[in-house]
Every structure is written in C-alpha cells, then in structure tokens.
Amino acid sequence: MRVVLDTNALIRAHGRTSTQARILLEELLRADHELITSNELLAEVTKVLRYPRFQALYGLSEADLLDYTQLLQSVSQVVILDSSYRAPLRDPNDLIVLQTAERGEADILCTNDGNFYDPTILSYCTARGIEVCDESTLLERLMQGG
C-alpha cells in the first residue's frame, strides 16, 4: 500500500513521541508499505517543528530535526512536485499534501484535516484512485493486517 501521511501526522510522528501518529509511521514501515513524501512536505514538517510552541513541547535540536528529516527521506519515496499544480482545495497549504499523494500515485492519503473530507475533494481523490482516511482508521487497518 502506498501512503501519504499529511504534515500534521508527520509532525506528531517524530522520534520523541509515542503518539498515534508515531505508532502509525512505525507500523507502515514495519509492514513494508510505501511511505510517499516530497521535499516540500518534509520542509514544511521541519519548519513547523522549529516553531517556538513545538520547540517548547518537544525540545528538538537541529540535529534531531535533521535526523528525523533524513530518516523520512531514507524510508520514503520522495516525489517531485510541480509549482503550477492546482486542485479544488480551500486551503492552498493543503496543495502540497494532495499533490504529493497524486504525484506519488498513493493508495491512501492519511489525514485528520477536515478540508480533505469535503465532498468535492473526496470525489477529486476518488477519481484519482486515492482513498482519504484518518489516522485511527488506517492504524486499525494496518493492525488487522491490511
């Protein structure tokens, strides 16, 4: 199964946590599924983890951030995005996530972001063979051997 975890999931999945997102990432990799990322997605994750509130919460050093980014790059298929990409999303920041899924021919785009559950976006994704599901649903599926 080819999976894109959205920015928020990847932020919560770094090595200093035991969150559902971290368990999901570990299970994806353990079960030999393919994680799909893009340089833009990884840059956004790194940028957000540098925000003061996340630094206060997680206390990640620059070395920790570099290690995490390198880990994600090494275990994922990194796809190249097109800056002219357009899709019917309300939040332009979500374009990176959606384009990563589309370019990477993902089977699943895993997100808890309500914008992706808009009927227009669900139809857009379905037409491209991409299922949108939340972290809990995907983790449950993986735990059942899916």
Language model: regions and residue ranges:
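PIN-domain endoribonuclease scaffold, especially VapC-family toxins
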Residues: 27-84
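Active-site neighborhoods of divalent-metal-dependent phosphate/nucleic-acid chemistry enzymes
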Residues: 73-109, 120
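Hydrophobic/aromatic ligand-binding patch that stacks against planar heteroaromatic rings
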Residues: 27, 100, 124
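Acidic, PIN/NYN-like endoribonuclease modules and their adjacent C-terminal/linker elements
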Residues: 104-108, 114-146
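Short, well-structured N-terminal submotif of metal-dependent ribonuclease cores
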Residues: 1-37
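Alpha-helix capping/helix-boundary segments
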Residues: 9-10, 41, 96, 115-116, ...
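A secondary-structure boundary/capping signal
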Residues: 6-7, 37-38, 112-113, 134
